[in-house]
Amino acid sequence: MADHTEVMQGINKLPGISYPVLTPNLKGFQAAVAAGAKEVSIFGAASELFTKKNINCSIEESLERFDEVMTAAKAASIPVRGYVSCVLGCPYEGKISAAKVAEVSKKMYSMGCYEISLGDTIGIGTPGSMKEMLTAVMKEVPVGALAVHCHDTYGQALANILVALQMGVSVVDASVAGLGGCPYAQGASGNVATEDLVYMLNGLGIHTGVDLQKLMDTGTYICNALNRRTNSKVSQASCRL
């Protein structure tokens, strides 16, 4: 995150689009606001070991740090989104209990996060575990304040997202060309490809307002810039890369 000020200042910001910045603590929040951020995100986890590896503290300590960020954000009228990582499994602890996910989600929502994004960080979840986890979390957080964030490491992302949609979740995180990963979860692939998600939503008759052709063109652009191959099955099938 050392160059986020440069990145923020270099973005050609368009109306109607949010450019949230990940802020692990008050210092990060202050730097983000100074760089022009109008929305921030705090990122916790349902795994003690992952939290220690990721932000070098316990879950309880991370929540205390987030409380400082929330207080400052409220004072500045800046909306905050909350992320909970490892909701369906952890690279260090293995299976994570749905009750723990619900507990952390409830605490972050109660702090004032307008939305809680539930992340399958290592992409190990299945439709069954997604349903079990969401059932537990929805008892503590309104479904209208939930989002899912599915990595596609095991090829389960779209199936898991479909379950979430059927359970009432209407916000889904995705990544153009499926780029990304996690430095603290070796072997984890990127988030579900936005192209594949939009293709599926189109097939379900769900209007997204996203132009699939332009989306694929964007994927082609960034993959060429990074010298990477797209992870989007839709783009691969369209022979774009």
Residue ranges and their predicted role:
Residues 1-241:
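Catalytic cores and adjacent flexible loops of soluble metabolic enzymes
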